[in-house]
A protein has these predicted regions:
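C-terminal ends and interior cores of transmembrane alpha-helices
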Residues: 88-116
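Residue-level signature of mid-helix packing/kink "hotspots" within the transmembrane helices
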Residues: 32, 60-68, 171
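Conserved small/polar residues in nucleotide/adenosyl-binding loops
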Residues: 200-206
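Glycine-rich segments within core transmembrane alpha-helices of 12-TM secondary carriers
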Residues: 160-175, 181
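Extracytoplasmic
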Residues: 16-39
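Hydrophobic core of transmembrane alpha-helices in multi-pass small-molecule transporters
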Residues: 108-136
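Cytoplasmic helix-loop-helix junction between adjacent transmembrane helices
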Residues: 127-164
Length: 207
C-alpha cells in the first residue's frame, strides 16, 4: 500500500475498533440493567424470585442460541447495519419491558389482582426473552468487522484491547442504573436504552 492508503487504512481500523467497542459496551446497558432492577421488581411490582429466575434462565438460553444463529446471519449481511439495528431493537424491547404495568392494565382493565400481576409478568417475560434473542446481534458483526480490518499479526493484541468493552459496559451500567434507582426509582432502570438508541446512528465502515 502507498503511504496514503496505509494512513487511510489505519484511520478506518482505529475507527472500527473504537466504534465496535462503544457499540458492544452499550449492549450491556440493555442486558445487565435487569439484574440491577430485580430487587425493585420484586419489592414494587410483587414479581416473585421464581419468576425473575425464569426470566434470567430463558434469557440466557435464548441468548446463547441467538449468538450461534446470528453468527451465521452476520456473515451474510451488512455487519454495520446488523449491529446497529440489533442494538436499537434491544433498546426497544427494554423500553417495552418498562411498560409492563400499563400493558397489563390495557389488557385486563385492572390495576391490581392476580390477573393483572400474571398478565404483567407474562408480558415482561416475553419482552425479556425477545431481548435475549436480539442480544445475539452484538458480537458476531463485531467479530466480522474486526477480523476484516485487523491483520492476523495484530489481531491478538488489538482484540485484547477491544475485549475491555465487556468490562467498560458492565461497569458503566452498574453506575448508571445505581444512580437512576437511587434518584427516580426502579421504573426508570430501562432508561439506558435511550443511550443505546442514540448510538445506533453511528456510521461504521462498510464490510
Amino acid at each position: 500500500m502507498t503511504p496514503e492508503q496505509t494512513k487511510r487504512f489505519k484511520y478506518w481500523q482505529t475507527r472500527t475498533i473504537i466504534a465496535t467497542m462503544v457499540g458492544y459496551a452499550l449492549f450491556y446497558f440493555v442486558r445487565k440493567n435487569f439484574s440491577l432492577a430485580m430487587p425493585g421488581l420484586e419489592a414494587d411490582l410483587g414479581i416473585s424470585k421464581t419468576s425473575l429466575g425464569i426470566f434470567l434462565t430463558l434469557n440466557g438460553v435464548v441468548y446463547g442460541l441467538s449468538r450461534f444463529v446470528n453468527g451465521i446471519l452476520a456473515d451474510r449481511m451488512n455487519a454495520r447495519w446488523y449491529m446497529a439495528i440489533g442494538l436499537a431493537l434491544c433498546a426497544l424491547a427494554n423500553f417495552a419491558f418498562g411498560f409492563g404495568e400499563d400493558v397489563s392494565y390495557w389488557i385486563t382493565g385492572q390495576h391490581d389482582g392476580s390477573q393483572f400481576t400474571n398478565t404483567m409478568i407474562l408480558f415482561m417475560g416475553i419482552m425479556w426473552v425477545i431481548n435475549g434473542m436480539l442480544q445475539g446481534t452484538g458480537f458476531p458483526p463485531c467479530a466480522r468487522l474486526l477480523t476484516h480490518w485487523i491483520p492476523p499479526t495484530e489481531l491478538a493484541t488489538k482484540m485484547s484491547v477491544w475485549n475491555t468493552s465487556h468490562s467498560i459496559g458492565a461497569g458503566l451500567v452498574v453506575i448508571l442504573c445505581g444512580y437512576i434507582m437511587g434518584t427516580v426509582g426502579m421504573n426508570m432502570t430501562a432508561d439506558p436504552d435511550a443511550v443505546a438508541v442514540s448510538y445506533t446512528h453511528l456510521t461504521l465502515p462498510t464490510n
